[in-house]
Amino acid sequence: MAESIIIRVQSPDGVKRITATKRETAATFLKKVAKEFGFQNNGFSVYINRNKTGEITASSSKSLHLLKIKHGDLLFLFPSSLAGPSSEMETSTSVGLKAFGAPNVVEDEIDQYLSKQDGKIYRSRDPQLCRHGPLGKCVHCVPLEPFDEDYLNHLEPPVKHMSFHAYIRKLTGGADKGKFVALENISCKIKSGCEGHLPWPNGICTKCQPSAITLNRQKYRHVDNIMFENHTVADRFLDFWRKTGNQHFGYLYGRYTEHKDIPLGIRAEVAAIYEPPQIGTQNSLELLEDPKAEVVDEIAAKLGLRKVGWIFTDLVSEDTRKGTVRYSRNKDTYFLSSEECITAGDFQNKHPNICRLSPDGHFGSKFVTAVATGGPDNQVHFEGYQVSNQCMALVRDECLLPCKDAPELGYAKESSSEQYVPDVFYKDIDKFGNEITQLARPLPVEYLIIDITTTFPKDPVYTFSISQNPFPIENRDVLGETQDFHSLATYLSQNTSSVFLDTISDFHLLLFLVTNEVMPLQDSISLLLEAVRTRNEELAQTWKKSEQWATIEQLCSTVGVQLPGLHEFGAVGGSARAATSAMWACQHCTFMNQPGTGHCEMCSLPRT
């Protein structure tokens, strides 16, 4: 019997097969490895396990058989210059996924929570099919795995995409425990550092050439549901279109929670919509540079929120008397245009999903896309989507273009002297019913889209207070709705609740307090944000006694709006408030002057 065996050795440059024998010593085997990979004898290390345990040393006189290395085993080679396996190697087993991915990254709280859950679908005893006692189990009542396709297909409505954590359980299940599986991010670029030839376009080899991509409909999704906390959040966003007829754009701020309708599912809960600077028309949107973007993210983080997605309108009135809108996005046209898919892919690349199971420390994205558009009943509907990881890679590496005259089609770029683009294919059915492979020039974008259910809760949730006279939303100057101290004074005069926290708990108001140019409170508002986040009235009362709120009151009193409830929110005594109410602001330099003076103490100009 021949004792020759083949051992696979994985390095950062790929996997190679080494022919050896069972009785061969470790030193002899390592010499073969060094020759095959082009290393010096001491320029690398070989391990049995990916986490750098079980090193095979040249000083060992043991045979491969005694080292329990069998035919077909996979060993791991690390050059001496590499600090660790996580920078280049792929993930393998379920234990290995945790140890050999990116152990230093901190995943989102929802991912940490779901990774510890059982996830199995428990079923009760079937009185007709089960023939055992109440404590027994059979094939009709044994718990199902969270990725069971038959169970997902029989839900109402059926679930086409399993959750991401269910997908992880599927990869790490089975006899091999995911030994040959890797959460690998797709790359469409030529690998750098290949010294065997001239750089592109003068040379390329199979070592540095990216693989061709065959588009498949993604079987899993990173987010399974989008839920707006209440109708007011969405209605205020739609008010812009109702008043102007122009399309509008916004960022969704909220949190990720467990979606219990799907095994190990994730829900994106939307608490507020921030509207950045933009130019909208009836059929187009242009985003402008937002100097406040980082500040908004910081304030949201202190409120326990984060940017979870983006939303835009695509609404056209059909009958203004009935209040109906046109039903334009359907199976006969498109659900997302190629341009929107590229935009969604760009947003998802900017907001990657932190994942310790990937060598890169991230895999996919939980950033969602919401569209306010007409439904089959000609009423406004909210639809949710993501684009696949393949689409993210094509967008990130600038390989995908939109089609100008066909919004439902994209176009994979062709290679040029400046950029190599791998071939992109998709599978289709021809007129004879045969499955054929087509080059993605053009490409139906339906291969890139993942649909997500979008809902409103039966019992509304309110992270922020709801007012009959809310504070104006930012960047709506075109409507005559501006954020200034006059609008703040008007808001305070119309909201005279005795609970200060209810009055101040408005996302757009808090942003104004931080970002206004007259009296920005970015350095002194942390206590108030903590009060809003925890719904703590005592903390809010403590903050309202600060000098900052007293100054805000003084500025509001100079705009000519009576604040009947000002005494409830003031931070000083009654006599001080009386003196403050008599102070006046110079119309020329805004200096606050003492009562009884007719000229400004700062610029000496008359009061009127």
Swiss-Prot record:
It holds the Pfam family NPL4. The modification N6-acetyllysine is found at K179. Gene3D superfamilies: Cytidine Deaminase, domain 2, Phosphatidylinositol 3-kinase Catalytic Subunit, Chain A, domain 1, Zn-finger domain of Sec23/24. GO terms for molecular function: ATPase binding; K48-linked polyubiquitin modification-dependent protein binding; K63-linked polyubiquitin modification-dependent protein binding; protein-containing complex binding; ubiquitin binding; ubiquitin protein ligase binding; zinc ion binding. GO terms for biological process: ERAD pathway; Golgi organization; negative regulation of RIG-I signaling pathway; negative regulation of type I interferon production; proteasome-mediated ubiquitin-dependent protein catabolic process; retrograde protein transport, ER to cytosol; ubiquitin-dependent protein catabolic process. GO terms for cellular component: cytosol; endoplasmic reticulum; nuclear outer membrane-endoplasmic reticulum membrane network; nucleus; UFD1-NPL4 complex; VCP-NPL4-UFD1 AAA ATPase complex. The modification N-acetylalanine is found at A2. Residues 226-363 form the MPN domain. Heterodimer with UFD1. The heterodimer binds ubiquitinated proteins. The heterodimer binds to VCP and inhibits Golgi membrane fusion. Interacts with ZFAND2B; probably through VCP. PANTHER family: NUCLEAR PROTEIN LOCALIZATION 4, NUCLEAR PROTEIN LOCALIZATION PROTEIN 4 HOMOLOG. The ternary complex containing UFD1, VCP and NPLOC4 binds ubiquitinated proteins and is necessary for the export of misfolded proteins from the ER to the cytoplasm, where they are degraded by the proteasome. The NPLOC4-UFD1-VCP complex regulates spindle disassembly at the end of mitosis and is necessary for the formation of a closed nuclear envelope. Acts as a negative regulator of type I interferon production via the complex formed with VCP and UFD1, which binds to RIGI and recruits RNF125 to promote ubiquitination and degradation of RIGI. Belongs to the NPL4 family. Binds ubiquitinated proteins via its RanBP2-type zinc finger. This is Nuclear protein localization protein 4 homolog. It comes from Mus musculus (Mouse).
